[in-house]
């Protein structure tokens, strides 16, 4: 009998320290905080920034046909002031305008300036075709000191038509041009507003002046308005330039009797390009696709916080300076006690800790994968990553950044220049609209990242649960869960046995008999906390009942012997 008790006690002692296999996940001592739909500041193992803040303070022009207009304004390439002589015809896929650039020489302005500027920025350059206009009875060599080359001159692409003699009669004229090309033609003309009525009479003769322009889609009449104005470049007169896009096979007709600045050549757009206003230096050693006034944004990120006004293939501008995208699982740093694997922690929390609700701590040493196993048996302790579950999670997380980029990237146009009086109202609307769009996209960006982060954390927890269920289904009744991500195995499980559990090749039938015997032996000597509680409550109840019975018996004896009297009053 004594021998049996000794053997049973020895067995109980051995299997309290039974072989174990635990499941866990990778952790780091210092993770990165991200926001999800339901919670802010969740720490994850890995995360990547989605907002670009690094600016290249140069115009990266490598691989591009770049035209730096310098002192020439972009609109000047159409009419031809002296500073634009080398850009009357050009080809480019990147057009750079400088702050010093000027569109005109004789003072004046363009009608619908910003619309024309946007057209030319995207033009890919321009080429010209002579319109074939000839004139009789007038002078075609009007010039001004405001447009100097070696001497007084005029716009290279325009003709300043004057009376044949000072104060002479300017004949009524009609000129037409048909666009025989397969692409639209840009037609530009001017209306001269003299500095005084006397000057207008000297240049174009007496009488009222009227200029009418029409095509199939356009009709407009202009009346010059002579009068004194502040002098600019020594001139008190002004020239207002007007333009239209003439469709193929359409004809434009000009009817005039003076004060008309006639077009000499029609302009044709070459293709496609980007145009940027910037004083940043050109750099042919770097490549870029996104530009702004301060330089180039080179980034594969979906968002940027550098400039709200950009052109090209650019990240979306958002107000946030940082939006972290989770690319790893929720981080639960390993507790110091788990690093030491003390006997106390083994007994209280299981061997290695855990995550995902039932696993309390991660493993900082698990560097080969996101998920893995740790085991303890007679041969010692070991750690191994689970590559299949790791790869499954990585495959689903990879591409999150690219998907964000696909949802957000598009070409943007830069509208950030001077507006005339009417266009200032449009400009205010554009600026208000842009600000509203920024607000919306800042919210959208935060929402998109939060959704992806929520999905990542839920996904990685799900993979952990799948791995746990795979082990539980293999072991069945051969092991018992300890509630901390570990399984206490009721048979001897060497390293090969542990490997079979990890590889999903474990044969529970092979160890079933040994496991059942050991489970019975353990249950015979080890009471669970539930049974202990039941016995304690039963014992307490029995003691109370016995005490009450003794007390009642004593009272009954005392009353019977007359030692105690009970009086009931009504």
UniProtKB/Swiss-Prot annotation:
Extracellular side: 19-533
HAMAP family (UniProt xref): INFV_HEMA (MF_04072)
Cytoplasmic face of the membrane: 555-570
Protein name (database record): Hemagglutinin
Additional free-text comment from the UniProt record: Major glycoprotein, comprises over 80% of the envelope proteins present in virus particle.
Site entry (Cleavage), positions: 349-350
GO biological process: clathrin-dependent endocytosis of virus by host cell; fusion of virus membrane with host endosome membrane; fusion of virus membrane with host plasma membrane; viral budding from plasma membrane; virion attachment to host cell
Lineage: Viruses, Riboviria, Orthornavirae, Negarnaviricota, Polyploviricotina
The keyword Glycoprotein is annotated on this UniProt entry: yes
Keyword entries, A-Z: Clathrin- and caveolin-independent endocytosis of virus by host, Clathrin-mediated endocytosis of virus by host, Disulfide bond, Fusion of virus membrane with host endosomal membrane, Fusion of virus membrane with host membrane, Glycoprotein, Hemagglutinin, Host cell membrane, Host membrane, Host-virus interaction, Lipoprotein, Membrane, Palmitate, Signal, Transmembrane, Transmembrane helix, Viral attachment to host cell, Viral envelope protein, Viral penetration into host cytoplasm, Virion, Virus endocytosis by host, Virus entry into host cell
Subunit structure: Homotrimer of disulfide-linked HA1-HA2.
Cysteine-cysteine disulfides: 22-486, 60-286, 72-84, 105-147, 290-314, 493-497
PTM note: Palmitoylated. In natural infection, inactive HA is matured into HA1 and HA2 outside the cell by one or more trypsin-like, arginine-specific endoprotease secreted by the bronchial epithelial cells. One identified protease that may be involved in this process is secreted in lungs by club cells.
Subcellular location: Virion membrane; Host apical cell membrane
InterPro entries: Capsid_hemagglutn (IPR008980), Hemagglutn_HA1_a/b_dom_sf (IPR013828), Hemagglutn_influenz_A (IPR000149), Hemagglutn_influenz_A/B (IPR001364)
GO MF annotations, alphabetized: host cell surface receptor binding
S-palmitoyl cysteine-type lipidated residues: 566, 569
Residues with glycosylation annotation: 30, 46, 249, 431, 503
Main location class: virion
Biological function: Binds to sialic acid-containing receptors on the cell surface, bringing about the attachment of the virus particle to the cell. This attachment induces virion internalization of about two third of the virus particles through clathrin-dependent endocytosis and about one third through a clathrin- and caveolin-independent pathway. Plays a major role in the determination of host range restriction and virulence. Class I viral fusion protein.
Annotated organism of origin: Influenza A virus (strain A/Equine/Cambridge/1/1963 H7N7)
Membrane topology field: Single-pass type I membrane protein
GO cellular component terms, A-Z: host cell plasma membrane; membrane; viral envelope; virion membrane
Leader peptide range in chain numbering: 1-18
Record Pfam families: Hemagglutinin (PF00509)
Record field: transmembrane: 534-554
Record family assignment: Belongs to the influenza viruses hemagglutinin family.
